[in-house]
């Protein structure tokens, strides 16, 4: 089934030997599941059947009746996710989700300068920017200019390659 494929996708990705990649997929699993759980609760849907994955957090989302699903100490960004889940306007909601992801990537690669992880983050950020250029040309262009400026600050290109 579709749910089984999603479970397998995340399980496989979270076993990646690259710590950043496995953390990235774990982080996205948390974001997606928590937002699904809040939305399902709001519309009185069966939460358990909508949660993807087999982690302790997934189990808490499936079984807890607590307002925060008992995850306040477990999920660092829970309060942000609560606020995002309360955002009715969909484009604004998407922007907040991407901002959360963007901040997480920046935090996780703060000390990585020109590593594979930093390149992966750069590609993920370009993907986000591409989406936002389509949705909001001004904001997307701004993001693109800021990431290029940041790259110029980060990377020292040898004179012979300039």
Briefly describe each language-model feature range.
Residues 1-2, 6-162:
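Extended alpha-helical surfaces
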């Amino acid at each position: 089934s579709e749910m089984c494929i999603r479970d397998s996708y995340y399980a496989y990705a979270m076993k990646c030997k690259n710590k950043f990649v496995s953390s990235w997929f774990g982080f996205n699993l948390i974001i997606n599941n928590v937002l699904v759980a809040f939305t399902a609760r709001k519309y009185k849907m069966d939460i358990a059947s909508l949660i993807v994955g087999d982690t302790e957090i997934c189990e808490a989302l499936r079984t807890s009746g607590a307002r925060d699903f008992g995850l306040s100490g477990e999920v660092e960004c829970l309060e942000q996710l609560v606020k995002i889940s309360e955002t009715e306007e969909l484009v604004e909601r998407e922007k907040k989700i991407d901002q959360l992801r963007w901040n997480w990537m920046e935090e996780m690669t703060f000390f990585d300068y020109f590593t594979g992880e930093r390149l992966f983050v750069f590609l993920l950020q370009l993907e986000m920017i591409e989406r936002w250029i389509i949705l909001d040309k001004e904001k997307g262009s701004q993001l693109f200019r800021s990431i290029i400026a940041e790259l110029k600050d980060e990377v020292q290109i040898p004179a012979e390659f300039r």
